[in-house]
Amino acid sequence: MRTRSACLTVCLTMTGLLLFGSAFAARDSHLEPYGTAKKNMHPYPRINRVYDVNYNKPQELNALYNFITNVNKVVPGKTVVVLHGAEIRAFAQENYLKYQAIVDKMASLAKRGVEFRMCNNAMHAAGFRARDMDGFITVIPAGFAEIIYLESKGYRYINPVPTPVKDSRCLDNPKASVCKHRS
């Protein structure tokens, strides 16, 4: 009798788990009509790249720092940043204290081999001269011409739009577990 009762309990428990589990699977299946993503964590060949930077605000250089850092982790090759927007004021020595955090980040990239080239035309239009700029900056004749030149030498063009993705999941799903501590 005990054996039969134990068997019945086990059978009911297993049936319940199967039904309960399949209810969850059925409930979530409408959220996965295309299945789930595959991973392809392949290595990249050596690729030289040129970043076309024309930002409205120096603070947007933080996104550039993240772009370059992340790409350089997985893609070998040379990195050149061509600056020709309002962000150039961050590199003026007179503004160092105001933009110290971001300039120090850019200088750390320069120490790791990233080249920073600044458009002479943009620099003059902003009211600066080469002697006003930080020492890791190289002033070049024209930003767009430099980009064209580097592309002709095999560099790949990157336009790093400073749109952050951090916490973007929380915009559509504020109840997601990763969002709870960010409220």
Residue ranges of model-derived segments:
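Bacterial N-terminal signal peptides that target proteins for export
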Residues: 1-10
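Bacterial N-terminal signal peptides
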Residues: 9-19
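Secreted/extracellular ectodomain signature
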Residues: 25-183
